[in-house]
Amino acid sequence: MAEQVKLSVELIACSSFTPPADVEWSTDVEGAEALVEFAGRACYETFDKPNPRTASNAAYLRHIMEVGHTALLEHANATMYIRGISRSATHELVRHRHFSFSQLSQRFVHSGESEVVVPTLIDEDPQLRELFMHAMDESRFAFNELLNALEEKLGDEPNALLRKKQARQAARAVLPNATESRIVVSGNFRTWRHFIGMRASEHADVEIREVAVECLRKLQVAAPTVFGDFEIETLADGSQMATSPYVMDF
């Protein structure tokens, strides 16, 4: 029987920063946000902080956002490990081509018992949920039947790994879009801001919006100034969205 899985987003990597020993400059933060500030000051040789209004890291980064110099954000990177996301949502995610992706392979990993992501609109209605889970079970049954038949059909192939791969890549055609996937996503801060600005919008699909909001939460901890302009709101249906006054600056 198909089992439901919930979304999980983890920040597994974020840029560190080692300032050059021979540059006389210091700042009040470490890591990715210090790197962004250093890159900006390197453009204009302002390591001595001549403008008191942008002397702190937070003030400097806010100024970057205000004037639209967001190219500096491309020096800092973050990597997320996302689980409990449907294949249909990952198809939307991979359209953001400035990210780098490594996704669970349905050719090498058996999908016959994988979990499913239930859309919220269906999950909140017991009758619709029962119909949905029945459809998942039927598609899983068809997958396993096809897989067994294909492995038998390919029985003359001496390489067992190749035989299984060829069988899975054909049988997976009947797997539903709701099948859970797992994906590692890496991108610079500018790309993450663009993704959140586009996909945390109330006009985005509910699932990809949830992914974007969860990524934002992780990034607001790792880089509170760079992502602090985004505000998370709860909509009438209980789902969440995020907005920023700088969202049109991407």
UniProtKB/Swiss-Prot annotation:
PROSITE patterns on file: THYX (PS51331)
Enzyme active site: R199 (involved in ionization of n3 of dump, leading to its activation)
Catalysed reaction equations from the record: dUMP + (6R)-5,10-methylene-5,6,7,8-tetrahydrofolate + NADPH + H(+) = dTMP + (6S)-5,6,7,8-tetrahydrofolate + NADP(+)
Disulfide bridges in this chain: none
SUPFAM superfamilies: Thymidylate synthase-complementing protein Thy1 (SSF69796)
Pathway(s) per entry: Pyrimidine metabolism; dTTP biosynthesis
Keyword tags: FAD, Flavoprotein, Methyltransferase, NADP, Nucleotide biosynthesis, Transferase
Motif (ThyX motif): 95-105
Protein family: Belongs to the thymidylate synthase ThyX family.
Stored PANTHER family: FLAVIN-DEPENDENT THYMIDYLATE SYNTHASE
Record-given protein name: Flavin-dependent thymidylate synthase
Organism lineage string: Bacteria, Bacillati, Actinomycetota, Actinomycetes, Mycobacteriales
Gene name per UniProt: thyX
